[in-house]
C-alpha cells in the first residue's frame, strides 16, 4: 500500500483490518480488536468504511465497560452531518446500548427511535422497536409500550416471528382483568396457539394463558397452561422457572405445602443463585420445611 503524506491509499487494507477487528471481537479479544480499529482510524481516515469502523470501536469500548468513552465518541460522530443510512442506524443503536448499560433509559429511547427509523434491515427494525417497547415498559409508560409492541405485531412477516409473539405476550401482561374483555383475550390467544408458525413459541403463549387464568383465580386452568408451557421445550430457562414458581404459588395458596415445596425446588434449580428472586424463593422454601414436618 502507498503511504501518501502519512495516510495510506489501499482500499483493500482497511477492509482487511476491519475483518480482523471483528474476528478478534468475536473471540472476546477486545484490546487487540481495538488496536486493529484504531489502526484503520489513523491510517485510513478517508476510507468509505470509516463510520463503520468508528461504530465498531465504540462497540468494543462498551464491551470493555468504557460506556462514558463510547458515549462521548458516538455523540461526536453523530454531529457529523454526512453520516446517514445504516451507519446512522448503527451509531444510534450503539449509543442506545451504552445508555441502557448505565441505566439512562430515556436517552436510550431517543437514540433507539432514530436507529429504528434509519435502518434498512427489517430484522433490526423489529428488534429495535421491541426493545423500545421494553424500555417504555420499564419506565411504566404503559400506553407507549402497548403501542410500540403493536408496531412490531403490525410488521407481521417483515419481523422475525419471535418478536411478534413476544409482543403479543407483552401486551397481554397489560390486560385489565377487572374491566377487560376476557372472551376476546381467550379467542386471540387460542388463535395464536393454533397458528402453525407459532409452534416454536408455545412455551411463551401457554405461559401467558397460565397467567391469564391465574390472575382470575382459576387455579386448575392456570396449572394446566403452566404445565403445557413446561412441556413445550423452552430455550428460556427463566420462563421455565417462572412456570414452576407460579404453580408452586398456587399449591401454596391451596395449602398443599409438600407439593408447593417440590415446585419451588424445581424453580430454584433453574434460577441464578445470585439473584434476589432466588433468595426470596429459597427463604420461602426453607420456611416450608417446618410446615411440611407437621403436615
Which role does the model predict for each range below?
Residues 1-295:
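Acidic, polar-rich low-complexity tracts and alpha-helical solenoid repeat scaffolds
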